[in-house]
Amino acid sequence: MDYKSSLIQDGNPMENLEKQLICPICLEMFTKPVVILPCQHNLCRKCANDIFQAANPYWTSRGSSVSMSGGRFRCPTCRHEVIMDRHGVYGLQRNLLVENIIDIYKQECSSRPLQKGSHPMCKEHEDEKINIYCLTCEVPTCSMCKVFGIHKACEVAPLQSVFQGQKTELNNCISMLVAGNDRVQTIITQLEDSRRVTKENSHQVKEELSQKFDTLYAILDEKKSELLQRITQEQEKKLSFIEALIQQYQEQLDKSTKLVETAIQSLDEPGGATFLLTAKQLIKSIVEASKGCQLGKTEQGFENMDFFTLDLEHIADALRAIDFGTDEEEEEFIEEEDQEEEESTEGKEEGHQ
């Protein structure tokens, strides 16, 4: 964590320092002990343990007598995969530097007088700060508006209580959206595997088909090209469908990621009023985005290409009529041949009589 460069970027070093000391999980100042991940991001050890336990539900605690092989989870900041040994998060190194900075920061804050920060003012009463929230109109306002102004008949609540409530709701929405992004990423991985298996299966049936045609290549050369083309068309059709799905899910993931970034930036607003001016619409957008992820998927057995297999146990006169078929069609063909042979035999016997 580059604290020096972060502090230089703005004119208020203490506010910037406080932002650097916020845990991305609990959204509060780091609680000691603070652990540092391999990707160099920091977490409260309690928060790190919470997400580790959520990602590894069958991992037992440090005091268990059962020998565990460890587990893994993703850094909430950069999504880098963190691999743990059998000690879990207790095997992570403590960031003593950050802990010392937190102590110094708290001492500095306790010794400094409260400073007047920027606070939104009421548009109707320019000398009044926005300090209450109108529940009826769902907007922040000032006390004068409640006593004498347009919100006189409205129901109001303390700004801080509404701020905390909507902040909690937004946190829950972010968690829900992040979980949805993980599911989308899983689907993308599955689709990529599906694409690979489809290619492998297509290659396999092509090889099998080529080997069977080699025995009768002189007769089947033209037919061979035709059937291979059909397999290729089916492969391209399936791969085009899968590629389109991957692109749709990737676009959904990109939109969700941008929305998460916007929401996290909104959480960094130091004042409740500024936050509440945009929080309602932001929460609505996140909920709609979470409900809107209704994209298509491949059906079970989509990658299967077995219906292109061929059995070349046919007489030479039937070679030019060969096509991909089912077992039932082949059985009917055999039954028709047997019936023709029986009729021919019966006719010969009647002729001898």
Swiss-Prot record:
InterPro entries: COS_domain, E3_ligase_FN3/SPRY, TRIM63_RING-HC, Znf-RING_euk, Znf_B-box, Znf_RING, Znf_RING/FYVE/PHD, Znf_RING_CS. It is found in: Cytoplasm; Nucleus; Cytoplasm, Myofibril, Sarcomere, M line; Cytoplasm, Myofibril, Sarcomere, Z line. A zinc finger (B box-type) spans 117-159. Its main location: cytoplasm. It comes from the Eukaryota. It comes from Homo sapiens (Human). This is E3 ubiquitin-protein ligase TRIM63. It holds the Pfam family zf-RING_UBOX.
